[in-house]
Structures are given as structure tokens and as C-alpha cells.
Amino acid sequence: AERNLLAENVPADHIFVTGNTVIDALHHTVRQDYVFPAEFSDLDFQSHRILLVTTHRRENLGEPMRHVYQALRQLAEEFPDIAVVFPVHRNPKVREVVRQELGDVPRVHLIDPLDYEPFANLMARSTLILTDSGGVQEEGPALGKPVLVLRETTERPEAVAAGTVKLIGTAEANVYEEARHLLTDDAAYRAMSEACNPYGDGQAARRIVEAIRCRYGFLDHGPERFEA
């Protein structure tokens, strides 16, 4: 964003790099003492590593999604210590394929879409996230969770460059191998989970307020720059 503004001849001293306020909201929402809704009553966070899955994008409808779900079936069958939690999009085309491929698989929890608060707290308690969502690519890494992106391209290339997310597409073999790699290789897992999130550190709102106060003369200096 800063490069784009500079390319448009916005003066550098008019630009404040603050990070994204979505990360602030995330940190305010996630709580250690959060109590999950009733649909989580049969989910054991202590005994299972949680794989959180979301899929909804139109380009993945049909066979691409089916391949993803077949890979999830393999993972659930191979790793008895994982539980797959899948808030299923309400699109009937998504639900039909999900039920066909995962409806009878032990430790695969197919639930209705979640509001932001339970979803954010579920991300915080997950081991690994597989998604074709955009926002999750920012939020998951802020919680130290590797994110495997079920797409060929992303509008968030900074996350790929930072190593917090990885584009893996929807091919069954690739989804299976990439997820399995992170579930079995501690060093690979740490490399992603400990990479610096390029989208914020939870202090964006404070920096924005300080920038505004500086602009109107209430402070004699702007906020420190957010650096990923």
C-alpha cells in the first residue's frame, strides 16, 4: 500500500504504516476463557490437534472441492490424533459434496458457519488451517497458525513472501502431502508458525490515533512505523 501511494506521488511524510486494524480486533476477540457454543460439546481440544477448514470460493466448486475433501479424509484416517473442524458454507453445491466425501468420517466435525467470535477463538485453538478465504490469510498467522491456501493465486502476496501462508491449490495429492508435512515435521511447522505476520501486531488503532493527533498538532511526532 505504501509503495502504491508513493507511486501516486503522495509525499512520504504524509504516509503512516500502521498495520491492519483487523489484527487489533482479532486480539480483542480471542480469549483464553472463551466458552464455545453447544455444537462444540463433542470436540476435545486437549486430546486432538485441530485442523480448521473453510471452503467457499466459486472457482473451487465441484471437483476441486471434492479433491480437497478426499485429501482431508486421508488425513483423518491416517492421523488418529487430529480432528477436522469444518464450518460448512450454506451454498448447497458446497454442502452436497462435503456430505458425500466427509459425512461418515470419524473425527470430522461438519458444523454450520460461525459468527466471528467463535471462529476467531477456534482459529486460536487450531493446529493448522486450510482455507480458500482471504481474511483468514491475515488472521491465522497473527495467532501463530500455519495457513495452507487452497488456491493457485492470492491477493495477499505479502503473506506468501513472509512464509506465514503457502499456496497449495486443490489437487488431492498436494493438499494431503502439504498438510501431512506440517503435521509430521516440527521444524517446518515452526518455520511457518513463528514467521512474522506482515499485516499487523495488534497496535494499528493506536498508531492511527497518534497519526491523526500528530496531523492536528496534538502530538509533535507521528507513531512508530509498523515493521513486519
Report each predicted region and the residues it spans.
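A donor-sugar binding/catalytic signature common to diverse glycosyltransferases
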Residues: N121-V160
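Short, acidic/turn-prone active-site loops that include or flank metal/cofactor-
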Residues: P113-Y116, E152-E155, E172-A173
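Donor-nucleotide binding loops and adjacent catalytic segments primarily
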Residues: Q32-R125
